[in-house]
Regions:
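Interfacial "coupling" helices/loops that link adjacent transmembrane helices in transporter permeases
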Residues: 355-399, 481, 771-810, 817, ...
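Membrane-proximal juxtamembrane linkers immediately C-terminal to transmembrane helices
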Residues: 114-137, 156-160, 198, 261, ...
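Mid-to-C-terminal secondary-structure elements
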Residues: 6, 170, 183-207, 216-342, ...
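Short juxtamembrane loops and helix-capping segments at transmembrane helix boundaries
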Residues: 118-136, 258, 264-274, 325-334, ...
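Negatively charged linear elements and acidic catalytic determinants
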Residues: 1-102, 289, 308, 312, ...
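Short, strongly hydrophobic transmembrane alpha-helices
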Residues: 95-121, 125, 354-356, 399-404, ...
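Alpha-helical transmembrane segments of integral membrane proteins
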Residues: 67-98, 328-334, 362-389, 393, ...
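Membrane-proximal extracellular/periplasmic loop immediately following the first transmembrane helix
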Residues: 126-170, 282-287, 302, 522-585
């Protein structure tokens, strides 16, 4: 306790130094006067009395210094001295301070912004307690589980405190307002217990309410309760219709609970007796809470063993099926969202390193002008460690100022991201409503600032402290030039900056070009004249194939009669949607695969006969579907050109037969009656995959979209289209009604923003690299000014001087390109796996970007090099 009090007393001394010094001086003067008076009384003269008093006290100033040392914290006090001195030096050089702070603000700001986005998309969508104990059980590749397998996992799994299943889908909500399409989840009774959450109003599902006949209850999300029911507590207990069936609303979940995101409501998952023994249809997602003493590896080992046991017991369905256990966070992260977020984190991290390298170069340049100052401080007793600490303190001060400005820049970036993003993306991408600068972002910013300050300052500080006192005191002579090692280090920094700028600009160019090529391919479908809308026919209201077909026939006929409608079609997915393309296995007659793993796969599409004409998809061979292709006739299919060439090379695919499903499935064989041009339905594919089309009349359960090609503006038919659908079924909402070009833009806008952001970051890196080139060239020319003057006086031509001055910059550029081009090629291969149209060896990009970058670097180096040709030789000779 006494030591702690002493420490607090010493800490207080730092902030009351002037008052304490005044008190100490007064006390010392008082003691001195007392000794002088005693000596005077002893008969001494005043001069002798004062001399003897000073001798007795041991020297006033020495005593004061001893007292100060006893009551001070030397390390902290010297650190405060470094901070005060550093602030004065930064204020003394406002130009340097502004450029360094701006550079670090850009680097730290974009890192903070992307960190906040990553936290919102990859962490906050699951605002659940004890998230580390929540896991998902899959059958590999995040695939769902069959109902019978789920029941086995539930009864035999010993690693889980609670295990539940859910099935998420779009649902039609009617009653208490206009018909609305919502995203819902059918869940087992223990679902919310497994998640560790409970309703904030009403109650949760009871045991037995997930059995057929007892499942007519629903729980609302907080968002839906507010939006549709005005947050009215009286809404609980009332009845709404979900997919045509009545449900009583019994509870409201907390606003933070939206799993599986972004869910609007939850209903019980009532498995029928037939479903409970079904092992063929993998349709359930499993979520579980681990027991306190069980690790993820233990649960994974248990499920792996259970999977093997089920494979032995049920080889027909479970032979190639293996269970896996994943952290729930990893399971719910979209692979595309994660890939692009990780990509952006890597890019902005590189930008921050470039910013640190640039600030380090600035500090190298500044250190050369401070050598006299550092030499004088060393001559007065400052050790090398103290000099390094002083310069590191200044670097960290710069980084902290950059962090403060970077927070403002990050806040602006996040505002721009949220405010300018289309509502479709905000709704689809869970996490947008959670984007904010929170305590985690502030901590990240401070950590980034400290790391940046150290990275940007450590090498200049160490290099500057190596010079001897006599070298620094010869300021103005040729001995004041920096050493070869320092010059090489600065050149290495600039080389790295140019190389990184090359990689980023190439990546941005590839993304932007791929995005433009992809969206440009949509022009072939003339999307600006097509209106699309979604309809979700609930199985409870349309259980029979004939009922579904009757609805589509009526809808197509009614929509065809709209004024301005040219053609109407039903289909399951539109081009470049990335939100509805369904792939599945199939078999080729005569070449049935030995197992599911070796089975070929393709995009599966269901279309009405008018679809190819509506979307301007070319029929390359054979015929289109017709009204004669009915359920009772020969099952038929259209295949894409890629599928035909892959599985029947050198021969016609017409008349060949395929079957949807795995080797064990017993579906009908489909006869290929036509070959279509390739269409890219999912833009995350690098190339259009093989596609199989089935007629609506033979597979009506898969269609969910209607399209109308119009003469004029398709948006003008919006209200009339809704009215026609309502006239057929008043409880059926027509959702996502919009022109096709708008829908395609909304589905690809995230990629466009990624390309634009990478482009901006690439330009920032390029600007920083150009400034670095200019700085090192300007300093090199300044160092060699007298040499150039002497050369001119000795007869050197200005072209020779221009070459000598610019050679260093050209060598840096050559080294940067030698490093950057292979890295850019490697990055291009990664991007090629993310987006259609991105070629890892695009000649235009890989030729154009280096040329542009070289021109920028050449321009930056030419300005100081040209200045070298104008050196006055007489002034140089006088100096010599």
């Amino acid at each position: 306790m006494n030591r702690f009090r002493a420490w607090l007393f010493r800490l207080g001394e730092l902030f009351q130094k002037e008052r304490r010094d005044r008190d100490l001086s007064a006390e010392m003067d008082s003691h001195l006067q007392l000794h002088i008076e005693d000596n005077l009384h002893a008969g001494m003269s005043r001069a002798e009395a004062q001399r003897q008093a000073l001798i007795k006290l041991g020297g006033v100033e020495q005593t004061k210094e001893m007292v100060r040392d006893l009551r001070a914290l030397p390390l902290l006090e010297s650190l405060l001295q470094d901070i005060r001195y550093g602030v004065r030096m930064l204020l003394k050089n406002p130009g340097f301070t502004f450029v360094a702070v701006l550079t670090l603000a850009l680097g730290i700001g974009v890192n903070t912004a992307v960190y906040s986005l990553a936290e919102a998309f990859l962490v906050r969508p699951l605002s659940l307690p004890n998230l580390h104990r929540l896991v998902a059980i899959t059958t590999g590749q995040k695939s769902p589980v069959a109902a019978a397998d789920y029941l086995d996992c539930k009864t035999q799994g010993q690693s889980f405190e609670q295990l539940a299943a859910y099935r998420a889908s779009d649902m039609n909500l009617t009653g208490s307002g206009e018909p609305e399409r919502v995203y819902g989840a059918a869940v087992t009774a223990g679902f919310f217990t497994a998640l560790g959450v409970a309703p904030v109003r009403g109650r949760g599902f009871l045991i037995g309410e997930d059995e057929p006949g007892h499942d007519q209850v629903a729980i609302l999300s907080y968002r839906l309760w507010q939006r549709r029911f005005g947050a009215d507590p009286v809404a609980l207990g009332k009845t709404v219709n979900i997919d045509g069936k009545p449900y009583t609303m019994i509870g409201v979940m907390d606003r933070s609970v939206e799993f599986p995101v972004p869910t609007d409501l939850w209903i019980p998952l009532a498995l029928s007796p037939k479903e409970k023994v079904n092992r063929a249809a993998n349709s359930l997602h499993l979520v579980a809470r681990l027991k306190d003493n069980v690790s993820l590896s233990t649960a994974r080992a248990e499920m792996t063993l259970l999977g093997r046991q089920l494979a032995d017991a049920y080889p027909n369905t479970n032979k190639d099926r293996q269970f896996d256990v994943l952290p729930l966070v990893e399971y719910v992260e979209g692979s595309i969202t994660r890939a692009y977020t990780v990509l952006m984190l890597a890019v902005v991290g590189i930008v921050l390193l470039v910013a640190c390298a640039n600030v380090a170069n600035l500090q190298f340049t500044r250190a050369s002008s401070r050598r006299s100052e550092l030499a004088i401080r060393e001559a007065f007793g400052a050790g090398r460690a103290r000099l390094v600490r002083q310069m590191l303190t200044e670097s960290i001060l710069l980084a902290l100022l950059g962090a403060a400005a970077g927070l403002l820049f990050a806040k602006f970036c996040l505002w721009l991201c949220v405010s300018k993003m289309p509502p479709y993306v905000v709704r689809l991408w869970a996490g947008f409503d959670k984007i904010r600068l929170d305590a985690g972002a502030l901590f990240f910013t401070m950590a980034a600032a400290l790391i940046s300050g150290i990275l940007a300052g450590i090498l200049p500080a160490v290099a500057s402290s190596k010079h001897h006192t006599t070298d620094g005191l010869r300021e103005g002579g040729r001995g004041a030039t920096v050493g070869r090692g320092t010059r090489r280090l600065r050149s290495a920094f600039v080389t790295a900056q140019v190389a990184v700028a090359l990689v980023l600009v190439v990546g941005a160019a590839l993304l932007i070009k791929g995005f433009r090529q992809m969206t440009g391919s949509a022009e072939a479908y003339s999307p600006e004249r097509v209106l699309i809308l979604g309809v979700n026919l609930p199985a409870s209201k349309y259980p029979q194939t004939g009922e579904r077909l009757a609805f589509y026939r009526k809808a197509l006929a009614d929509l065809s009669s709209l004024p301005g409608a040219q053609s109407v079609a039903a289909f399951s997915c539109y081009p470049l949607s990335n939100n509805g393309a369904i792939w599945g296995y199939f078999q080729v007659l005569g070449r049935v695969a030995p197992d599911l793993r070796h089975s070929p796969w393709a995009d599966m599409q269901t279309i009405s006969p008018e679809y190819l004409g509506l979307m301007h998809v070319a029929l390359l061979a054979g015929r289109e579907f017709t009204s004669d292709d009915r359920e009772a006739t020969q099952p038929v299919a259209l295949v894409s050109q890629k599928l035909a060439q892959r599985y029947w090379p050198g021969e016609s695919a017409l008349g060949k037969q395929i079957r949807i499903g795995g080797p064990a499935d017993s579906g009908p064989w489909l006869t290929v009656v036509g070959i279509t041009a390739d269409v890219l339905y999912d833009w995350t594919n690098q190339v259009p995959p093989p596609t199989i089309y089935r007629p609506l009349t033979q597979a009506p359960q898969a269609a969910s979209l209607l399209g109308i090609r119009t003469v004029g503006d398709p948006a003008s038919l919006g209200q009339a289209t809704r009215a026609r659908i309502a006239s057929i079924d008043p409880e059926l909402p027509a959702f996502d009604l919009k022109p096709l070009d708008v829908a395609i833009h909304e589905s690809t806008v995230g990629l466009g923003y990624t390309g634009a952001m990478m482009g901006i970051l690439g330009l920032i890196a390029l600007a920083v690299a150009v400034v670095g080139i200019y700085g090192i060239m300007a300093y090199t020319v300044g160092e060699r000014t007298n040499e150039f003057g002497v050369r001119i006086a000795m007869g050197a031509q200005r072209e020779d001087i221009l070459w000598l001055a610019s050679r260093h910059g050209l060598l840096i550029s050559a080294a940067a390109f030698a490093i950057g081009l292979p890295a850019a090629i490697a990055g291009a291969r990664f991007l090629a796996g993310l987006i259609y149209g991105t070629s890892p060896g695009d000649p235009v990009v890989f030729a154009g970007v280096p040329i542009i970058l070289f021109a920028a670097v050449l321009t930056a180096g030419y300005i100081p090099a040209h200045r070298a040709t104008r050196v006055d030789p007489l002034a140089a000779l006088r100096y010599e």
